[in-house]
């Protein structure tokens, strides 16, 4: 389906993994889009108008239709633009991709980053709890080039935008090697494979800028 850039608009924030994964999906499918950078602190009238429920990015505007929440947007993109499928066709495999994506956003993010930043139980305890979660993903990607198999898919976009190109830079800023190669060889191999994909590289935020951004996030978490 040929689209013009003005038909597809994405409101996002440069350091947001939720925004990055949507951009990866657009690039994977070759969909032209207009990107509108948002200030997530001083939210624009446009953002508040089109996403009054969550008041956050990303937001997709397509031919007057508005969608928020990255998982919802990714599924919608996959249904509208059929080329280079993101989700598996098999119902069970599709359900499992959605399951693990939810696991990444709802379990890995809060435990592996927020808990470590707060360190209420001590940093070492928090790291141990986080690494127990990563072991599930280590097993899930074992023997595969990507979570999606030979090509990147839904879970690769979700986990890839969140773990190596967001959380890992936060851990780096805290001086923590959360996913050491000797303990997680499969995850590290997967990360290397991701970095070889052009559309992924195009969507990765600048490393040093993101590390500084994540340091500020850590300070906000600690002071909350």
Curated annotation (Swiss-Prot):
Task: Please name the CDD domains in this protein's record.
Answer: GST_C_Tau (cd03185), GST_N_Tau (cd03058)
Provide a Gene Ontology MF annotation, just one: glutathione transferase activity
This entry's Enzyme Commission designation comes to 2.5.1.18
Provide the residue positions that the database annotates as binding glutathione: 16-17, 42-43, 56-57, 69-70
Which InterPro entries does UniProt cross-reference here? Glutathione-S-Trfase_C-like (IPR010987), Glutathione-S-Trfase_C_sf (IPR036282), Glutathione_S-Trfase_N (IPR004045), GST_C (IPR004046), GST_C_Tau (IPR045074), Omega/Tau-like (IPR045073), Thioredoxin-like_sf (IPR036249)
Pfam families assigned: GST_C, GST_N
Location in the cell: Cytoplasm, Cytosol
Instruction: Give the highest taxon in the source lineage.
Output: Eukaryota
Instruction: Please list the GO biological process terms of this entry.
Output: glutathione metabolic process; positive regulation of defense response to insect; toxin catabolic process
Keyword vocabulary terms for this entry = Cytoplasm, Detoxification, Phosphoprotein, Transferase
Name the reaction it catalyses: RX + glutathione = an S-substituted glutathione + a halide anion + H(+)
Look up the record and report any one GO term of the cellular component aspect. Answer: cytosol
User: Which parts of the sequence carry Phosphothreonine?
Assistant: 151
GST C-terminal domain sequence ranges = 90-217
Name the coiled-coil region(s). Answer: none
Location of the GST N-terminal domain: 6-85
Q: List, alphabetically, the SUPFAM superfamilies matched.
A: GST C-terminal domain-like, Thioredoxin-like
Major localization listed first in the record, in broad terms: cytoplasm
Q: Which family, according to UniProt?
A: Belongs to the GST superfamily. Tau family.
State what this protein does.
May be involved in the conjugation of reduced glutathione to a wide number of exogenous and endogenous hydrophobic electrophiles and have a detoxification role against certain herbicides.
**Name by which UniProt lists this protein:** Glutathione S-transferase U4
């Amino acid at each position: 389906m040929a689209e013009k850039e003005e038909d597809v608009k994405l409101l996002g924030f440069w350091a947001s993994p939720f925004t990055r994964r949507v951009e990866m999906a657009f690039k994977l499918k070759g969909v032209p889009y207009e990107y509108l950078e948002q200030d997530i602190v001083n939210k624009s009238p446009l953002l508040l108008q089109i996403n009054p429920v969550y008041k956050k990015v990303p937001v997709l505007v397509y031919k007057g239709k508005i969608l928020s929440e990255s998982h919802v947007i990714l599924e919608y993109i996959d249904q509208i633009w059929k080329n280079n499928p993101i989700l598996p066709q098999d119902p069970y495999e599709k359900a499992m991709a959605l399951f693990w994506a939810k696991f990444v956003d709802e379990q890995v993010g809060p435990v592996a980053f927020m808990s470590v930043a707060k360190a209420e139980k001590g940093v070492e305890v928090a790291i141990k709890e986080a690494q127990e979660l990563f072991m599930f993903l280590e097993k899930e990607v074992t023997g595969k080039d990507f979570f999606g198999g030979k090509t990147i898919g839904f879970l690769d976009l979700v986990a890839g935008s969140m773990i190596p190109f967001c959380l890992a830079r936060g851990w780096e800023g805290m001086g923590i090697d959360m996913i050491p190669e000797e303990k997680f060889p499969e995850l590290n191999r997967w990360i290397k494979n991701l970095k070889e994909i052009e559309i992924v590289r195009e969507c990765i935020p600048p490393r040093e800028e993101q590390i500084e951004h994540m340091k500020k996030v850590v300070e906000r978490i600690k002071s909350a």
